């Protein structure tokens, strides 16, 4: 394959990563918005649509592996393809978190919300903004931006802790609220884990540009979200 053709296919593959990122960002937005609106039709649509996210991830992986197998890329190109594989996986998992939030919407059903979602919409906004900027860093090969973004995870963590405290207070006041409080805590957890996975993407950006393997993502004990 001529170098020009390889470069064109590599750029197209990176564009597909951005498409997948946009799909996931939209899913995160809709998952929280539909919960806020109590729109279970939208939640079901989101759950069904997660199949498209999975298919996009698998298509990206297949194309990346084909380039690796047939072109035997070296150095920077190989790191870029490795990053594409990793980032596609991280994005697909974020899509699972959005699907999990939609499922929680269905589990809550017609029950009135304990409180207007506390800081959950703000958590979602922060996580989406981090994701958007991480993908920008990937496209621009911006190491400084990739190193800066994970520091914003502290804000998401603080919001998670605030949600936890508020839900605990509500449970203590009325133990009958424990089931929905637990559901909302899982929403917060899924959003917090989304921000963590953005940090993983930033690690891959740094590796792509510098060849440096560095751990900048926080460790929260490996709890899984509802997905």
Give a label for each model feature.
Residues 1-227:
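Cytosolic, long alpha-helical scaffolding segments
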């Amino acid at each position: 394959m001529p170098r020009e053709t390889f470069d064109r296919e590599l750029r197209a593959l990176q564009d597909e990563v951005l498409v997948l990122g946009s799909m996931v960002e939209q899913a995160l937005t809709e998952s929280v918005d539909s919960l806020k609106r109590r729109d279970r039709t939208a939640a079901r649509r989101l759950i069904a649509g997660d199949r498209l996210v999975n298919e996009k991830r698998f298509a990206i992986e297949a194309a990346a592996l084909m380039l690796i197998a047939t072109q035997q890329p070296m150095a920077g190109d190989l790191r870029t393809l490795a990053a594409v594989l990793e980032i596609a996986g991280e994005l697909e998992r974020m899509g699972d978190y959005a699907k999990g939030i939609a499922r929680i919407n269905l589990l809550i059903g017609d029950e009135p919300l304990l409180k207007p979602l506390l800081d959950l919409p703000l958590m979602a906004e922060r996580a989406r903004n981090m994701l958007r900027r991480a993908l920008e860093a990937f496209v621009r090969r911006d190491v400084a931006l990739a190193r800066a973004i994970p520091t914003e995870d502290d804000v998401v963590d603080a919001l998670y802790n605030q949600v936890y405290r508020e839900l605990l207070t509500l449970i203590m006041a009325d133990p009958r609220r424990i089931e929905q409080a637990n559901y909302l805590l899982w929403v917060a957890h899924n959003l917090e884990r989304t921000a963590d996975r953005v940090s993983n993407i930033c690690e891959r950006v740094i590796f792509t540009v510098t060849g440096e393997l560095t751990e900048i993502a926080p460790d929260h004990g490996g709890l899984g979200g509802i997905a």
